[in-house]
Amino acid sequence: MHRHTRYTPELALMLGLLLPSAGEAACSRVINVPVAATGQSVIVDGDTIKGIYPDLLRTFTEKDGCTVALSAVPRARLEMLFETGRADLLIPASKTPKRDAYGTFIPLVHNRAMLISIQSGRAPVKTVQELLEQTGVKLALVRGFDYGQAYQSLLATLETQGRVIMEVDALSVARLLKAGTVDATIMAPSIVAGAMMDDERVRDLLDKLRFESLRELPWGNSGAYISNSALGAADKAALQTALERAARSGVVWKGFQQYYAPAVLQGSIRPL
């Protein structure tokens, strides 16, 4: 499962094809994009920000396109910045009704959050109700992650039951799993696997993960939200054009294939 493929010439060519042609409208100012570490989708290594989505966004700076300024923040703060109009883009993000109130969503891939644990003899879990009935199962979740109303309702119930620890990022969750402090988490498998790939303290868990889909957490869309309040109409249109071009090209799905082993993507990420 462990894979360290990175920015290949084939992927670079696909990204290059996304560059705007001469005459297309450029953004009127630098586009402010705070990001949070999200597996291999967004990798924060000191002052360096890289990964599937930073690779994509940097193609928007070429020629007469949009210059993007990336900065690293915790996920919960990222959500707050977007909701208050201080982030021009929220990426990556699953489509949810709450976020729809603040931005225009552009889908880039299909995704699904799953119940993730270390392989064991525990009885299978197929629904939220079954998870709630297994009262001995304690979870760690990332503060700021949102996979829709069913996820939020589950989170509220787990908090009431005292069965959840909220963490700042997926790596912190992975360390709790390894320590046995918690039994499971819920997120897109690529996120927690990506965090494990880049940290030797938890890398040995990669081949021991158990992925289970929950009926109430079906397939949805993941992509980018363009802020409704932070940008003018012309800049919103320019970003929407660039992101929709990326969606049509399939470059984001190709990026996932370059960064992740098939076992991580199966059942949780697929192309549009």
Tell me the role of every PLM-derived stretch:
Residues 26-101, 166, 259:
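Extracytoplasmic small-molecule ligand-binding "clamshell" domains
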Residues 77-83, 93-101, 153, 183-208, ...:
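A ligand-binding cleft/hinge motif common to bilobed small-molecule-binding domains
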Residues 54-63, 129-138, 220-257:
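Extended ligand-binding regions for polar small-molecule ligands
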Residues 70-133, 144-147, 213-217:
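Acidic, polar ligand-binding/catalytic clefts
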Residues 35-39, 111-113, 203-240, 262-272:
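Periplasmic-binding protein-like
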Residues 27-43, 128-147:
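Short loop->beta-strand "edge-of-pocket" segments that line small-molecule binding or catalytic clefts
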Residues 57-64, 133, 143-167, 174, ...:
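Ligand-binding cleft/hinge of the Venus flytrap
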Residues 67, 144-159, 238-272:
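Ligand-binding clefts/hinges and TM-proximal coupling segments of bilobed small-molecule sensing domains
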